[in-house]
């Protein structure tokens, strides 16, 4: 009997030790996630406050709004849930309802800001002239206000009026709801109506809009890349055909295959860029919103096909919040923000780089497909050399359009096509006064 008691005590101690180790690992992982989210989004906000040129671009207003929503996720949502995960119960009592409202509001605001960014970039690429006229700071603030207002309406009003909770079906469940849900944990059961309606507004409708906009952006970029490739091949072909042999006879000339390979490479890079944007977002949030719509339909029978354990649900909740730590890397890691981050962190002085040539592809704020290549010698500040191919009918941003050096740079290729401009210097803008609207066939109107 004494041996049996000793074995039982040893088994209990082993389980407790494993549970303690698991809690420590969980605490470390969640702390790193919260700190990375705080650091990334704080850097974005600090860069915008510190550098005036970042505030001058209307598109960055949406990036700032996204960073604020993600920062609120890291401050108002993540820490409280992390403490509950480590402690094994909800220790904050009646703060539960307010926390649930903050959770829904901040997460919805983050997703809606991502949707607004996708619409903004599509509009800038598809209708650049109209975008320059219509997308003023006032228009940007209106879009941002709509996103935040919708987030508040879908969160605080239903939660404070208890519209979001599922009604208890029996006395025992009612007691558990009134006691356990408030004191022991904060995993409130959503009603079916609220779960579906909030999921539609917070995720399914925005993700559908993002899929449509980014698909169209890729198609526009693909057409422009192929048009540019055709112009490059025509230029090389014409140059080769003008070369003569020693006796004055023209040499045989052929279309270069390298241009086709470069075109395919550029299309692949654009596709990868857009795939990362959508892939990260969908992978982080889709599992949670699927479960969010399934759990309210969890029955009381033996099979319970829509029921899952709380640990699985919490894991996918954290997957969704993790998207807030990745957004600064995806949306605020262009050349402007990278230089601002390097200045804020002192990396120009403390982080010397080796010789390295890096080529990246992106779609900039002006609606252009950008193939950037920068050479970074050791111990010096990196100098970007970007080749920007403007989408047909697209022009540069109106901010700072006073420099005219780009006109001289673009002249050689303007002879090939008035729809094409090449900018070799990142800091050089294209003057709207020097570029006339073009028709569908690529000619200036007469």
UniProtKB/Swiss-Prot annotation:
Disulfide cross-links: 96-186
One GO MF term attached to the UniProt entry: dopamine neurotransmitter receptor activity, coupled via Gs
Gene3D superfamilies assigned to the protein according to its UniProt record, in alphabetical order: Rhodopsin 7-helix transmembrane proteins
Segments in the Extracellular topological domain: 1-23, 88-96, 164-192, 300-312
UniProt topology in membrane: Multi-pass membrane protein
One Gene Ontology biological process: vasodilation
Family listed: Belongs to the G-protein coupled receptor 1 family.
Identification of the protein by name: D(1A) dopamine receptor
Annotated source species: Bos taurus
Gene: DRD1
